[in-house]
């Protein structure tokens, strides 16, 4: 969850992330795959769904995201062998998106925080980046969007503080 809050990556991208996708020396994370649960095509199969790892849905979603030093400091102690999933833990088993979403909801309930879905971390990241002064093109590329319109329409939410700050930029006309 920490990585999502500071990178804006999607839940499927987080679950598909392996340690070989994180360069601790270059302070970067490379998004090359996503994980999702799909309905089985065989209606008689014992398993009604299956988990797959594929390339992201668009070319723009294949990206390298620079990581701030403090993020590297937090994740470095957990680094493991290159082909190990970042979320695999001691059991070396994958953590798929549905499990991650359930954990997120449990953490919210435990903290008595109003219900939200995991994707809200991505929205929070985008809004915080705009508040911090990121330009929209850079943010759009970090989020893996094919156009800045997607970023502006769906992910950037202005706050009253930001609105006030922008309004303070206006100066009285000189006469």
Residue ranges and their predicted role:
Residues 1-12, 28-29, 127-128:
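Short pre-functional
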Residues 1-5, 118, 152:
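Short, well-structured alpha-helical segments
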Residues 4, 15, 140:
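The alpha-helix within a helix-turn-helix
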Residues 7, 65, 80-94, 101-141, ...:
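Short, basic (Lys/Arg/His-rich) helix/loop patches that form interaction surfaces
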Residues 16-77:
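Conserved tyrosine-mediated DNA breakage-rejoining catalytic core shared by Y-recombinases
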Residues 21-28, 134-154:
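Short, polar N-cap/turn motifs at the start of nucleic acid-interacting alpha helices
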Residues 41-46, 132, 153, 157-175:
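DNA/chromatin major-groove-contacting recognition/catalytic segments
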